[in-house]
Curated annotation (Swiss-Prot):
Biological-process GO terms, alphabetical: argininosuccinate metabolic process; L-arginine biosynthetic process; urea cycle
Keywords: Amino-acid biosynthesis, Arginine biosynthesis, ATP-binding, Cytoplasm, Ligase, Nucleotide-binding
EC class of the enzyme, as a word: ligase
Binding locations of ATP: A17, F18, S19, G20, G21, L22, D23, T24, S25, A43, G129, T131, D136, D194
Keyword Heme: no
Membership in a protein family: Belongs to the argininosuccinate synthase family. Type 2 subfamily.
Domain of life: Bacteria
Protein name listed in UniProt: Argininosuccinate synthase
A Pfam short name: Arginosuc_synth
Organism of origin: Burkholderia vietnamiensis (strain G4 / LMG 22486)
Main location: cytoplasm
Amino acid sequence: MSTILESLPTGQKVGIAFSGGLDTSAALHWMKLKGAVPYAYTANLGQPDEDDYDAIPKRAIEYGAAGARLIDCRAQLVAEGIAALQSGAFHITTAGVTYFNTTPIGRAVTGTMLVAAMKEDGVNIWGDGSTYKGNDIERFYRYGLLVNPDLKIYKPWLDQTFIDELGGRAEMSEFMNQAGFAYRMSAEKAYSTDSNLLGATHEAKDLESLESGIKIVNPIMGVAFWRDDVKIAAEEVTVRFEAGQPVALNGVEFKDQVELLLEANRIGGRHGLGMSDQIENRIIEAKSRGIYEAPGLALLYIAYERLVTGIHNEDTIEQYRENGRRLGRLLYQGRWFDPQAIMLRETAQRWVARAITGEVKIELRRGNDYSILSTKSPNLTYQPERLSMEKVASTFSPRDRIGQLTMRNLDITDTRDKLRVYAQVGLLTPGESSALPQIKSDSGE
């Protein structure tokens, strides 16, 4: 039997991930009128653009929900965000600027915690606002079924009857007004925004055009650093890690990591730190574009990466980066709790993060412009006296280096022989003005 229901299951409990916005409000009331028994579940993810979470379940009851619950997901969200940071689970970058996978992390937390709450209430049918062209429909599908194998999926936006009756925001607003709720449709923005405590995503509408840039976005976690009228003073900040966990900002220790990340958001946000413009591949392989904010994670990541490079050796760092990119893709695809992801994540947390203890001082300026001012750690393997150009006691002598270079003759000879072979088979041609062979063009010239 299919786990996806294409029509409303009347007379049955249907859980809906309820944001309180127009779409989910109209869907909930519509389901009630059509004979379903809707239950509303709201995730408190610390969204920076939401100021009254307690009012959301009350609105759900008003619109016809048989039950409504507010689930505090903030601690779990921050824990998963720090786990992603420790693992370097970020695969989308442009010219060194990183997207911190904040929406995929949020979906992992929401998809598991809301379905767990539904299961407690005997609700085994789940709906949410994700569309069939996006990533979230698959992420929620995977996480929901991981938690509840008996789960069925009903999405109003996949139900043709719902689409025919309430196919757009204007129709939804009129539907709510006719029902007596005086629901005013919010002003249309030039793009869509989704956010949580870790970061914000701006996409769709005008941002689908690559001719529209970051300047049309109004940041919700920071400042528009590209505007000349926005005054931003340089600021020094210290970040301290202990055994891979961020514990202090500017010398102030935080026992609660949610509070630490909120403060990191405030500090980074004052500069517009962590904003990026990315073109990415969705799960279905089509390309999309997003403008992202993550001021707090960006601040922590600068300090964490600095300590990683000062503490670990080259091969460990290489493996950390390669595995981090693989893990980032798994996270993006909704596989954060799959065995292969857990294996990569646990390895990084155990063998990379646990050694990360120290303090980094950073000067923040505008946007992603910053300088590292100092790095301190009892675990540093960076020891400048080993390579000092000054006359100091050295760990090896000139004769030692001569011997090491002499050993290189073997692989240099091998390389020269291989280049000769490539020239003989026509892959290379002798260069006229160079002692090295040149690669031939496809035309043979």
